[in-house]
C-alpha cells in the first residue's frame, strides 16, 4: 500500500474517512504525538525547524527589499520623504478596467502600484540606505542568509551533526550564549552600524565598504575612549535646525542623551539611539558571563532557584523543583517565551508611535496606524498561545511529586481564589463601565448631555504631570518648575524630554479626559476577562470539580457523555478557544480608541473625540459610521477610486467573518453534505469522474468545527478592520 498522509501516524493513515486529513493537519506539528518519537528526536526536530523559520523570515525580508528596489520609488522618496508616497510593489493586473489603472497609478509610477504602509522606507532611510543598489545588496545578503539557514537546518538533522539531549538541556551555556552572543554582540554590532554608517548618513556622508575605513565617525576617533574622556562623544550634537541627510546644522557627537525628537524628522535622535544600543550591549555582554559553565565560576540556575526560599515560609518550599520542571518541559519553556514575546510585541506597538525611532514615520499617519494595529493583534495571538502551552504543560509534563508545596503547586492549590478574584474584577469593571456608557447614552438621547457622568482620570493625569506634562496644572516632580529634578533635567539629562512631552505635535503623553477614562476601563474589562478564561483553562487543565480526571483526556476533547452531568466545553482547548474571541474583542477596543483619538489629533479636531467618546452612540456614529463612508464608496456606478481595493477587502472580510458562524453554530454536518454533494457531482461528470474521492466524508468533530469557525472569525475580523483602518486614514491624509 502506498504511503498515505500522515506518515507520522499509521493509525490515522489507515482511517478511511476525511478525519484522516483533518486530524493529520491538526497534529502535524505535535511532534510529541507522532509514531516512534523519542525525546532526542523531538528536540532535534524542533531545533531544525527553527532554522527553517529563520530561512523563511530572511527570504521574506529579502523579498521586501528586492521588490522595492525593482518596482518602488525609494530614490525619489529619499529626495522628498514628506510628499512622495512610498511604493511597495507594482500591481500586475488591476481589475475593474481603465479607471482602476488610473486610480492606482500614483507615487510617480508609470503603472498601477501598491503604496507601502509598513514603514520600511523610513526604516531603511534612517539606517543609512540611500540608493536602489543598496536595497539590492541587502536583498542578496538576506537571500544568502536564508540559504545558510536552510543548509544549517538540514545539517543538524544529519547523524554526525545532531545535538544530544544533554546539549539542549544545558541551560547555563544557552543563557550565556543567548545573552552575550545573541543580544550583546548583535546590539554592539548595531551600535557600530549606527555610528559608522547611519549617523554619518544623516549628516550627508555616504559611507560604504569602499570608504568605510577612511571616514572617521568622530573627528578624534577612538582617542576619547582610551583617554577616559568619554563625555567628548556627547559634545556638539546636531542642532535643532539640522536637515536630516545633509550637513546643514549637523554636529559631530555620536553618543548623546538629548531626549525628545529631532525637530524636522519628529523621530528620536540617532545619536541617542546609538547610545541606547551601546548601553544594552554592555549590559547583555556582562549578563552573558554570569552563569556557571566550564570554569566552575558564576551562578548555577538550579542553585539560584533552590536557594530562593521566601522569608516567613508563606510560600511553602518556594522555587524548589522548578529548575527540573522547566528544563524538562518544552511546553513550559515555550509558554514563558510566548508570554515574554507577547508583552514585548505589545510594548513595541505602544512605543513605535509615542517614541518613533524612524525619520519622518511620525508624519506618515496611515503607516503609524497600520503598525500599531498590526503589533497589537500579533501580541494578542502570541499571549493567548502562552496560556495554551501552559495548559499543555500541566497535562503532559507536570509532576506533582517533584513540585510538592512549591510556588507552582501552590498556584494550583489556591486556584479557586485566583479565579474568583479575576471573576469579581471582571464583573465589577463590566457592569460599572457599561453602566456609565449606557447612562450617558440615555442622557444624550433625552437631550440632556449635561447630565452625563464624566469622570476625570486624575490619577493618570497626575502620573503624566510627574513625568513633566504641565497642562494639567498639578505642579509635581518634573512639572514643578521650581523643583531640583526639573532644573537638573534642563541641562544634565535629556534636556529635550520636557519639550517633547509638552509639544502638541507628537503622540507622547496625549491629553486625557473622561472619554479616555471610560475606554480605559472597557479595555481593562477585556483584558481581565481574557485573562480569567485563559488562567482558568490552564489551572483547571488537570482537573476541576466537575471533572477531576480531566488530564487523562488530553488537551482538547469534546465531551465525556451525559453520565457526568455535562462535560462539554471544559477542555483546556475550549478555554483557549473562548479566550481568543475575547482577545480579538479587546484589541478591537484598543485599536478603535487609538485610531479615533489620533484621527482627531491629526485633523486638529480633538474635541470630536472628547465629546463623542463618552457614550456608545458616539463611538458607533462618529467613529465607525463616519469613517467607513469613504470605504463603502470605494467603487460605485461612477467608476473606481484608489480606495476600491480596500472597499472590496472590507466586503470580503465581512464575508469570511460571517462564514465563521456557519461552523461556530454547530453546523458541523455541512462539511459532510458539501463534500458528498461535490463527490456525487464529480462522479457523474465526464473527465471529472477520472478523479475519485476515496475518503468517506464525515461530519467535523465539535473541536474541528470550532477551530475552522474561529479561524474564519479571526481572519475575517482582522481583514475587515485592516481595510477600514487603512482606507479611512489614507482617504483623509493621503
Curated annotation (Swiss-Prot):
Catalytic activity: reduced [plastocyanin] + hnu + oxidized [2Fe-2S]-[ferredoxin] = oxidized [plastocyanin] + reduced [2Fe-2S]-[ferredoxin]
Catalytic activity, EC: 1.97.1.12
TM ranges: 46-69, 135-158, 175-199, 273-291, 330-353, 369-395, 417-439, 517-535, 575-596, 643-665, 707-727
Subcellular location: Plastid, Chloroplast thylakoid membrane
Annotated function: PsaA and PsaB bind P700, the primary electron donor of photosystem I (PSI), as well as the electron acceptors A0, A1 and FX. PSI is a plastocyanin-ferredoxin oxidoreductase, converting photonic excitation into a charge separation, which transfers an electron from the donor P700 chlorophyll pair to the spectroscopically characterized acceptors A0, A1, FX, FA and FB in turn. Oxidized P700 is reduced on the lumenal side of the thylakoid membrane by plastocyanin.
Binding sites annotated in the UniProt record for [4Fe-4S] cluster: 559, 568
UniProt record similarity statement: Belongs to the PsaA/PsaB family.
Organism from which the protein derives: Liriodendron tulipifera (Tuliptree)
Cofactor remark: P700 is a chlorophyll a/chlorophyll a' dimer, A0 is one or more chlorophyll a, A1 is one or both phylloquinones and FX is a shared 4Fe-4S iron-sulfur center.
Gene Ontology cellular component terms for the protein in this record: chloroplast thylakoid membrane; photosystem I
Topological type in the membrane: Multi-pass membrane protein
Name of this protein: Photosystem I P700 chlorophyll a apoprotein A2
Amino acid at each position: 500500500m502506498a504511503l498515505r498522509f500522515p506518515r507520522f501516524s499509521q493509525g490515522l493513515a489507515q482511517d478511511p474517512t476525511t478525519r484522516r486529513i483533518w486530524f493529520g493537519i491538526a497534529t502535524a506539528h505535535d511532534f510529541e504525538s507522532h509514531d516512534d518519537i523519542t525525546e532526542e528526536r523531538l528536540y532535534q526536530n524542533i531545533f531544525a525547524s527553527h532554522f527553517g523559520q529563520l530561512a523563511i523570515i530572511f527570504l521574506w525580508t529579502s523579498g521586501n527589499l528586492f521588490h522595492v528596489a525593482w518596482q518602488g520609488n525609494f530614490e525619489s522618496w529619499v529626495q522628498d520623504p514628506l510628499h512622495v508616497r512610498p511604493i511597495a510593489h507594482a500591481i500586475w493586473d488591476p481589475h475593474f478596467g481603465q479607471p482602476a489603472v488610473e486610480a492606482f497609478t500614483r507615487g510617480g509610477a508609470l503603472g498601477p502600484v501598491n503604496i507601502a504602509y509598513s514603514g520600511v522606507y523610513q526604516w531603511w532611510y534612517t539606517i543609512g540606505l540611500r540608493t536602489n543598489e543598496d536595497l539590492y545588496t541587502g536583498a542578496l545578503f538576506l537571500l544568502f542568509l536564508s540559504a545558510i539557514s536552510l543548509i544549517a537546518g538540514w545539517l543538524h538533522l544529519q547523524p554526525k551533526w545532531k545535538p544530544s539531549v544533554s546539549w539542549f538541556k544545558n541551560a547555563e551555556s544557552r543563557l550565556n550564549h543567548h545573552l552575550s552572543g545573541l543580544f550583546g554582540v548583535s546590539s554592539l554590532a548595531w551600535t557600530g552600524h549606527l555610528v559608522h554608517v547611519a549617523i554619518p548618513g544623516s549628516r550627508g556622508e555616504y559611507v560604504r565598504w569602499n570608504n568605510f575605513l577612511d571616514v572617521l565617525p568622530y573627528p578624534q576617533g577612538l582617542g576619547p575612549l582610551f583617554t577616559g574622556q568619554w563625555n567628548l562623544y556627547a559634545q556638539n550634537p546636531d542642532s535643532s535646525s539640522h536637515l536630516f541627510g545633509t550637513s546643514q546644522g549637523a554636529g559631530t557627537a555620536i553618543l548623546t542623551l538629548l531626549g525628545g525628537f529631532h525637530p524636522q524628522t519628529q523621530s528620536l535622535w540617532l545619536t541617542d539611539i546609538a547610545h541606547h544600543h551601546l548601553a544594552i550591549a554592555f549590559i547583555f555582554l556582562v549578563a552573558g558571563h554570569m552563569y556557571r559553565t566550564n570554569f566552575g565560576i558564576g551562578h548555577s540556575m538550579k542553585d539560584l532557584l533552590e536557594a530562593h526560599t521566601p522569608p516567613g515560609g508563606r510560600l511553602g518550599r518556594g522555587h524548589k523543583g522548578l529548575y527540573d520542571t522547566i528544563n524538562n518541559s518544552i511546553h513550559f519553556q515555550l509558554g514563558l517565551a510566548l508570554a515574554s514575546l507577547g508583552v514585548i510585541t505589545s510594548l513595541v506597538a505602544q512605543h513605535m508611535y509615542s517614541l518613533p525611532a524612524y525619520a519622518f514615520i511620525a508624519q506618515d499617519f496611515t503607516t503609524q496606524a497600520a503598525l500599531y494595529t498590526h503589533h497589537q493583534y500579533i501580541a494578542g495571538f502570541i499571549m493567548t498561545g502562552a496560556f495554551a502551552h501552559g495548559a499543555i504543560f500541566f497535562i503532559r509534563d507536570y509532576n506533582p511529586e517533584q513540585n510538592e508545596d512549591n510556588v507552582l503547586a501552590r498556584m494550583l492549590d489556591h486556584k479557586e481564589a485566583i479565579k474568583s478574584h479575576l471573576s469579581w474584577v471582571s464583573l465589577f469593571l463590566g457592569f460599572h463601565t457599561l453602566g456609565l456608557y449606557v447612562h450617558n447614552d440615555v442622557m444624550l438621547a433625552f437631550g440632556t448631555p449635561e447630565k452625563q457622568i464624566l469622570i476625570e482620570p486624575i490619577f493618570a493625569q497626575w502620573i503624566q504631570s510627574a513625568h513633566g506634562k504641565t497642562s494639567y496644572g498639578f505642579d509635581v516632580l518634573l512639572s514643578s518648575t521650581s523643583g531640583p529634578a526639573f532644573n537638573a533635567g534642563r541641562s544634565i539629562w535629556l534636556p529635550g524630554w520636557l519639550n517633547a512631552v509638552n509639544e502638541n505635535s507628537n503622540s507622547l503623553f496625549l491629553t486625557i479626559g473622561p472619554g479616555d477614562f471610560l475606554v480605559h476601563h472597557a479595555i481593562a474589562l477585556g483584558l481581565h476577562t481574557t485573562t480569567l478564561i485563559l488562567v482558568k483553562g490552564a489551572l483547571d487543565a488537570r482537573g476541576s470539580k466537575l471533572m477531576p480526571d480531566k488530564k487523562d483526556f488530553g488537551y482538547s476533547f469534546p465531551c465525556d457523555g451525559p453520565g457526568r452531568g455535562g462535560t462539554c466545553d471544559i477542555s483546556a482547548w475550549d478555554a483557549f478557544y473562548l479566550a481568543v474571541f475575547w482577545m480579538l474583542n479587546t484589541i478591537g477596543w484598543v485599536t478603535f480608541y487609538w485610531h479615533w483619538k489620533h484621527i482627531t489629533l491629526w485633523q486638529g479636531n480633538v474635541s470630536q473625540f472628547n465629546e463623542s467618546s463618552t457614550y456608545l452612540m458616539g463611538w458607533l456614529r462618529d467613529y465607525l459610521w463616519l469613517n467607513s463612508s469613504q470605504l463603502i464608496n470605494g467603487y460605485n456606478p461612477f467608476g473606481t477610486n484608489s480606495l476600491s481595493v480596500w472597499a472590496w477587502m472590507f466586503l470580503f472580510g465581512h464575508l469570511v467573518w460571517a462564514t465563521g458562524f456557519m461552523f461556530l453554530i454547530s453546523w458541523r454536518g455541512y462539511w459532510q453534505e458539501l463534500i458528498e454533494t461535490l463527490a456525487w457531482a464529480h462522479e457523474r461528470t465526464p473527465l471529472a469522474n477520472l478523479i475519485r474521492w476515496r475518503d468517506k466524508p464525515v461530519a467535523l468533530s465539535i473541536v474541528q468545527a470550532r477551530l475552522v469557525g474561529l479561524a474564519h472569525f479571526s481572519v475575517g475580523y482582522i481583514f475587515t478592520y485592516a481595510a477600514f483602518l487603512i482606507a479611512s486614514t489614507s482617504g483623509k491624509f493621503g
